[in-house]
Amino acid sequence: MISPLKNKDSFHEILNSEPFFLLVKPTQSIYTNSIESDLVEQEIELLIKAGFINIEISWSNNENWLNYVSNLRLKFPKLNLGSASIRNKKSIDDSIKTGCNYSMMRGWDRDLLNYSNSKNHLLIPGIKHLKDLKQAIELNCKIIKVYPVKDNIELINISQYKNINFIAAGGLSISDIPLYKSLGYKAIVIGDMGFKNNKIDPKIYEWLRRRSN
């Protein structure tokens, strides 16, 4: 298992060894119901024991999110913990405050990227248009998420960008890893297909067990 990244360069190491990120979208009941919250934490603990640490939490603009993610950071210091659906400066500030190692944008926002860079916080842009991809590269982005990837797989030919690490996202499951790895993506983001109704897809555990054998 790789230790949680201590700098941006370490993120590249994680991409080379771990082919997916699990996106958790907390429901209001996770914030307010300790039983549900404990169940999710048990699932995360099982993932860590299986050698998986790439968890990102969808950002919400409320105090409950801050408390929840801060608690995860304290309970699971080994997690490579990130925030997702980043859309404004407050979401960056909240991510830094809670100890997130990185964040991912849903779309492209040049000003937000510059703001995150000024805070020395790793923000991975979401790209769906070629013009946005070119802007991201001009700003020296070395890790870029293509979202939604199924709509853009033919529009964005990632093979021509040799020095960029691409992450695929949008409606993907653990079974999609071989396809997107073959297309040149370093990793994929698994959202609702991997975490739904506060439960992690059993196929993810199966995949992790096969990898460890």
Annotate each PLM feature.
Residues 1-99, 118, 174-175, 196-213:
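Conserved N-terminal beta1-alpha1 strand-loop-helix module at the mouth
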Residues 23, 53-62, 79-87, 92, ...:
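Catalytic beta/alpha-barrel core
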Residues 12-15, 74, 138, 159-160, ...:
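Solvent-exposed alpha-helices and their adjacent loops that cap or buttress functional pockets
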Residues 74-79, 114-125, 162-169:
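Short acidic, glycine/proline-enriched helix-loop-strand junctions
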Residues 102-112, 146-154, 184-207:
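Glycine-rich phosphate-binding active-site loops on the catalytic face of alpha/beta enzymes
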Residues 45-47, 160-161, 182-185:
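Short, solvent-exposed amphipathic alpha-helical segments in soluble enzyme
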Residues 88-98, 131-140, 154-156, 172-190:
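Catalytic cores of alpha/beta
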Residues 43, 112-113, 132, 155:
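Aromatic/hydrophobic pocket-lining residues that form π-stacking "cages" and hydrophobic walls in ligand
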